Amino acid sequence: IAYFSLDNPTTIDTILYLYVIVWAGRLGIFLFRRINKDGKDERFDKAKKKFFWFLQYWMGQAAWVVFTAGASILAILSPVEAELEVIAFIGIFLWWSGFLIEVISDYQKRKFRETSDPKTEFISTGLWGRSRHPNYFGEITLWVGMAVISLSSLSGVEYVTAIVSPVFVYFLLVKLEGVPMLERIADERYGELSDYQEYKANTPCLLYTSDAADDEERV
């Protein structure tokens, strides 16, 4: 809506708009395919039993959309007619890096689930051998890129939104919902497996290591 309210959108406005659309479309298709195949989203199994917990998750998702896209929306609506500069290209590089990491890690996880039983086996190959949550690493990097692209179109206090957006994504995924939930589920399923204990001890939560973990599948 913000983009189509403009009379003469700049190149940066168009890039921000298209990147948000691509991100939302890709994520929507991915989640639909996963839930359609599994019949549920196990992350919310326990929460659905308690109304206020489930409401909290939905409120968190709504806040996530607003805060993560905040910098992009303000940049699109900004009267500053910014041109593509070096900082914008840095942001574009970060966005594509994060997007590709997220897409590849989601694909690797999906292929693993098609050939393995996730209730007894865990993925530790590919990008998942370098990070326990490479998809979240990609998501955070993607939004850092969006914030950097937005900088050229922001001014004054608006710069704060460029910082708030990726910081909010980080805390939501790493401290509040994503990682804590998935780590708890993984610990319950595989906590007694020595291979899982070794994997968790030697593989960072987000940041990649220079050497991948053992490429042999751990079960």
Regions found by a protein language model. Name each.
Residues 58-73, 135-147:
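Core segments of transmembrane alpha-helices
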Residues 208-213, 217:
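Conserved small/polar residues in nucleotide/adenosyl-binding loops
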Residues 127-177:
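Glycine/small-residue-rich hydrophobic helix-like segments
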Residues 86-145:
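Aromatic-anchored, glycine/proline-accented short structural segments
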Residues 33-49, 107-128, 183-207:
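Cytosolic, membrane-interface loops and tails of multi-pass inner-membrane proteins
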